[in-house]
């Protein structure tokens, strides 16, 4: 696997980009998560960033990438509506792992947004998408630009939802390389990694939450529910950051 030209790949249509990365992805599928991170740092351009929602299994990718690339900027898009336990988890992991945390927020405060638009998350798919654009997508785009990112690591896994089931290890999104080192991990592998390194799940895991986002669009898992039904009232799985 040789170095890849981001500018040249960005000029290709999306289908052609996928084809151009196919051989590299076939090789990356054979590597461990740690080897994928090391390969990316050697063969893909900097600056490098890692995004995290500080969700249920967030400690895995934060620990894995940060131990190989200490001080990598960790991007959090803060909506202002996270659970108190999430903010506490952020503080705990930032201190424990010595994270270089970079917090990005919408230009409008949560209160101002509600005054202007009402409660967007109660306005169906269109409202949820507008909410996500304001609070997730725009802040992430700004983060990637300000941090001059060319390679973006994230902790997505295929097992998490149907929308993630066929994601490759390496892709191009928002004009930068996107690397998913633990994309093929199952829940058992996540658990074993956490145990091995003395790490914890998000505090709400013990209360029956399989996925954690904002207070108003996250539900506890109940028997018969798919994991994606615990977010956005089952209308959407993705918050917008990992789409497009």
From Swiss-Prot:
Q: Which GO terms describe its cellular component?
A: cytoplasm
Q: Principal localization? A: cytoplasm
Which cysteine pairs are joined by S-S bonds? none
Catalytic residues, chain numbering: 239 (nucleophile)
Please, which domain of life does this record's source organism belong to?
Bacteria
Instruction: Cite the InterPro entries for this sequence.
Output: PAPS/APS_Rdtase, PAPS_reduct_dom, PAPS_reductase_CysH, Rossmann-like_a/b/a_fold
Q: Which reaction does it catalyse?
A: [thioredoxin]-disulfide + sulfite + adenosine 3',5'-bisphosphate + 2 H(+) = [thioredoxin]-dithiol + 3'-phosphoadenylyl sulfate
List the SUPFAM superfamilies hit by this protein, alphabetically: Adenine nucleotide alpha hydrolases-like
A Gene Ontology annotation in the biological process aspect, one of them, is:
hydrogen sulfide biosynthetic process
Query: Where is this chain's protein located in or outside the cell?
Result: Cytoplasm
What family does the Swiss-Prot or TrEMBL record give for this protein?
Answer: Belongs to the PAPS reductase family. CysH subfamily.
- This protein is called Phosphoadenosine 5'-phosphosulfate reductase
